[in-house]
């Protein structure tokens, strides 16, 4: 940034979640530096905020080993071209948003050319493949972390990291409108309601749906009028779930929802869900939950040896204890899942204590992440 040249920020986002983060960051930066220039790899939201797209985000948004191998030559070409063009542009800061397999190498290339680099959204190095932290430390000037335990991990290895809070915590109210969500879904205010969230990936829906449905059948024995809502991320997952339900629980009445996962969580007294971001969202929705997860035996055997954390769900990692019941692999079976959910549906002391802790954790990570990220970029640009 000079008198002749405005603040110039280069960014690369590789998927929709990164596009959302990038758009929020650009918006916050423009409020402070209205004439700033933004260039790089951007999706529609970042472009709407004024980012000049040298490549469309979809070019990087490939999933799975086969798809990546099929596009590898193109991906390597894009990274080499960005290394060259950013090197010539000399932006004040480069921000790689998530997409670590693509961005961390690019960050390292740019740092060698004297360009300041930020990696926005920490990979799960604290959980597995921890030695990646050394590569990240060499490639970046700063990591922006959503969660406090991530910063503690980087501090241990002397890698500069800033905890900025979580954008999802900023977006969700501390006190959700449960009755409002029930009105949207057509659930009576006085009904007991359970949300089933068997995951967003095909393999998760295949492995978990039958046990989740059998669990709901058991719970109906105690709560005959139990309302069951099942949000599914897209038509493919809905079709998959309907096929499994027809085989396992054809007579079980449920509300199938297209998307609307957040509304389902807010409306429900309890949720049974796969681990992942959904558990964090459920915590922020203040919905008591049980995490059930199952994978293929060899994958689980491998995961047990690679994963270095005591818990798998983000609420437990944030709390530093088993706040939420985790039933994994052989433990993920209907009798045990139902037994863990019953006290939550009763809306007693267990639920209220969990709700209070969820609210405390929400406050801890509600830090206006867009503003915090913008401040970090400007400080590094000076």
UniProtKB/Swiss-Prot annotation:
Presence of keyword Lipid metabolism: yes
Record family assignment: Belongs to the LpxB family.
Any one biological process term the GO annotation gives: lipid A biosynthetic process
Species this protein is from: Escherichia coli O7:K1 (strain IAI39 / ExPEC)
The protein's Enzyme Commission number: 2.4.1.182
Gene Ontology CC annotation, any one: membrane
Pathway where this protein functions: Glycolipid biosynthesis; lipid IV(A) biosynthesis; lipid IV(A) from (3R)-3-hydroxytetradecanoyl-[acyl-carrier-protein] and UDP-N-acetyl-alpha-D-glucosamine: step 5/6
Keyword flag Cell cycle: no
Catalysed reactions, as listed in the record: 2-N,3-O-bis[(3R)-3-hydroxytetradecanoyl]-alpha-D-glucosaminyl 1-phosphate + UDP-2-N,3-O-bis[(3R)-3-hydroxytetradecanoyl]-alpha-D-glucosamine = lipid A disaccharide (E. coli) + UDP + H(+); a lipid X + a UDP-2-N,3-O-bis[(3R)-3-hydroxyacyl]-alpha-D-glucosamine = a lipid A disaccharide + UDP + H(+)
Function of the protein: Condensation of UDP-2,3-diacylglucosamine and 2,3-diacylglucosamine-1-phosphate to form lipid A disaccharide, a precursor of lipid A, a phosphorylated glycolipid that anchors the lipopolysaccharide to the outer membrane of the cell.
Entry GO MF terms: lipid-A-disaccharide synthase activity; phospholipid binding
Keyword terms, alphabetized: Glycosyltransferase, Lipid A biosynthesis, Lipid biosynthesis, Lipid metabolism, Transferase
Domain of life: Bacteria
Official protein name in the record: Lipid-A-disaccharide synthase
CDD domains: Glycosyltransferase_GTB-type
């Amino acid at each position: 940034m000079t008198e002749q040249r405005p603040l110039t920020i280069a960014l690369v986002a590789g998927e929709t979640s990164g596009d959302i983060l990038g758009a929020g960051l650009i918006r916050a930066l423009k409020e402070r530096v209205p004439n700033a220039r933004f260039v790089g790899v951007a999706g529609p939201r970042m472009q709407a905020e004024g980012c000049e797209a040298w490549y469309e985000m979809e070019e990087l948004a490939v999933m799975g080993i086969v798809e990546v191998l099929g596009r590898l030559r193109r991906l390597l070409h894009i990274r080499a071209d960005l290394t060259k063009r950013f090197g010539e542009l000399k932006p004040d800061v480069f921000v790689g948003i998530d997409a670590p397999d693509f961005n961390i190498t690019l960050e390292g290339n740019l740092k060698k050319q004297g360009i300041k680099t930020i990696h926005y959204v920490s990979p799960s190095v604290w959980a597995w493949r921890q030695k990646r932290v050394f590569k990240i430390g060499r490639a970046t000037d700063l990591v922006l972390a959503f969660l406090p335990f991530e910063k503690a991990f980087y501090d241990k290895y002397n890698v500069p990291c800033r905890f900025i809070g979580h954008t999802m915590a900023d977006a969700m109210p501390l006190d959700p409108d449960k009755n409002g969500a029930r009105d949207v879904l057509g659930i009576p205010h006085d009904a007991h309601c359970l949300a089933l969230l068997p995951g967003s990936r095909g393999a998760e829906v295949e492995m978990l749906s039958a046990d989740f449905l059998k669990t709901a059948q058991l719970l109906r024995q105690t709560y005959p009028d139990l309302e069951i809502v099942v949000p599914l991320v897209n038509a493919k997952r809905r079709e998959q779930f309907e096929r499994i339900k027809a085989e396992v629980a054809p007579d079980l009445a449920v509300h199938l929802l297209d998307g609307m996962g957040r509304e389902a969580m807010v409306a429900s007294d309890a949720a049974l869900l796969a681990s992942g971001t959904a558990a964090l969202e459920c915590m922020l929705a203040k919905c008591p939950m049980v995490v059930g997860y199952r994978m293929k035996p060899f994958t689980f055997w491998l995961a047990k040896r690679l994963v270095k954390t005591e818990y798998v769900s983000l609420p437990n990692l944030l709390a530093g204890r088993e706040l939420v019941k985790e039933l994994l692999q052989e433990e993920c079976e209907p009798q045990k899942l139902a037994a863990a959910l019953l006290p939550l549906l009763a809306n007693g002391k267990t639920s209220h204590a969990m709700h209070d802790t969820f609210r405390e954790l929400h406050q801890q990570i509600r830090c206006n992440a867009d503003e915090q990220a913008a401040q970090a970029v400007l400080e590094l640009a000076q």
